[in-house]
Amino acid sequence: RVSLQDNDQKALERAPALIEGALTTLTKGDAIAADEATAAQGKITTVASVPDAVEDAALVVEAVTENRDIKRAVFANIDASAPPDAIIASNTSHLDVFPLMPAGRQARCLITHWYTPAYIVDLVDLAPGPETTRDVMTMMHALYAGMGKYPIAFETFISGYVANRIQAAMNLEIFRMLDEGLASPE
């Protein structure tokens, strides 16, 4: 079961149609069967509040804008409502969110950075915090691998992860080639 929450009511109202569109794309591409798409859609519900979303959750994934104050507030709300044994994951693309996460839950906190569109791109970065247990990392790696994803587990937090760092290296090389006159922008 997946509970989806967003403070933007219009975004929350649009979510089921967007999910249905993604599942239709996967069905048309023969990535999943139509009955699997229907079953998946039936497991997703939208809810109005963070407490409603996380009250029975085994895994909570935070995916709000890259703003420390907003993330801190969301983590506090999750901490107040999620079961004590829930794993808390952040989908941050570059922030070190571990100082923002609940102090008493650090052993069960990690970063699970999905690439977009997540229903097509199979890569997921996993980064532990200073106190994240090996068991949590192993469990999350197995969960994502079981979904058909390719999790890349880091030993520690780094800013930028795999694809971002490869893209940065490619950009540097392209600009070097342009500067040296080895290639034209056209």
Task: Mark where each language-model region is.
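Rossmann-like NAD(P)(H) cofactor-binding subdomain of soluble oxidoreductases
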Residues: 59, 64-124
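NAD(P)+-binding Rossmann beta1-loop-alpha1 motif at the extreme N-terminus of oxidoreductases
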Residues: 1-25, 29, 81
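Internal alpha-helical scaffold of NAD(P)-dependent oxidoreductase catalytic cores
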Residues: 126-157, 168-186
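Conserved SAM-binding loop
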Residues: 4, 46, 90
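A structured beta-alpha segment of the ubiquitous adenosine-cofactor-binding alpha/beta core
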Residues: 25-81
